Amino acid sequence: MAYLIFSLSLLLIYLGLALALHVQFGMLGIANFGVVGFWGFGMYMMGIFQAELNMSFVDALFIVLVLSVAVSALMGWLVVRLDPQATLCTTIAFGAIIALLVVTEKWITMGVVGLGTIRYPFRIGGATEYIYFFFLVGIVVGMQVLVLRLHKSPTGKLLQAVRDNEELCASLGKNTFQIKMFWFVLTSVVMCLLGALSAPLNQFLTPNMIVPSVTFAVWIALVLGGKEHALGAMVGVFVTFGFFDILIETYAPVSPELAVVVPNMKLFIYGLALMAVLVFRPTGFLAPTTPPERVWGEMRKVAATAGSGGLALAKAGKDRLEATVFMPAKTTPKKSSEAGADEEAKE
């Protein structure tokens, strides 16, 4: 039962990471492949403050919050203006740098030896793990509710508009850099805090926890569930981590000979499922909550009446819309008959 609670708690952490990535990529269009970097940074900072400096959970969490804002703001300043390919390389490099620092900076991270033991914040006899589990449930449920409300709010529509056509939003007076910067920093800080909450769950931290497979697992879950749907992250995490890591690997009646093959088979099935979804259902198991036409409907109305006759033409594609803004000619040439009449009047 204790291992089940641990597995479900870890599932909640992955669900929180997927929700944060959903806002970053699904709503805003920033491809963050450094999820494990933010998560690992928060986890190791919490471990250092609690295990090495003997701080309380609340004090350590507050300092992790401050440091996370600084690191996320630095990364946001670097990646927000970049194109998708450069963003991909930069965020992957960030995750690799965090993993390298954990190994090399032995004076504070203990290197490959590991760091621990990290205490649970709530210690009430044998119910400590259960209380922490329900604590995580409350946090992740709150995140899911906020994401659902964000999708229905004007802010959510604005994020989707920036994702689909940043140039058009900028032409309408929206500060797209500020919008992307704020939401990237906010969601990255959430990833760091989820890492901090993972530290008491693992209790003993080692560098082999900060591996790219964490990022790929979150991405696969989001793509399978539906990157643009408010519930896509939840569905994807339950299908991948919940089904394979909890039900199959833990409770399926597998012989000892096949138990070694199950983890590799899991990755193989992940790959097949991902290819099938990308080919037959690119939007994931769930369709987008808000059709692009509905998002751009209001934008077209605003563009059509914006300053000195500006006109916006939106063309609906399968997954996104491309918009073109042009200015009408300043003068309209007169017809030949009208021009001749004017000349005769002057004479």
Q: What residue ranges belong to the model's regions?
A:
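Transmembrane alpha-helices and adjacent helix-loop boundaries
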Residues: 1-347
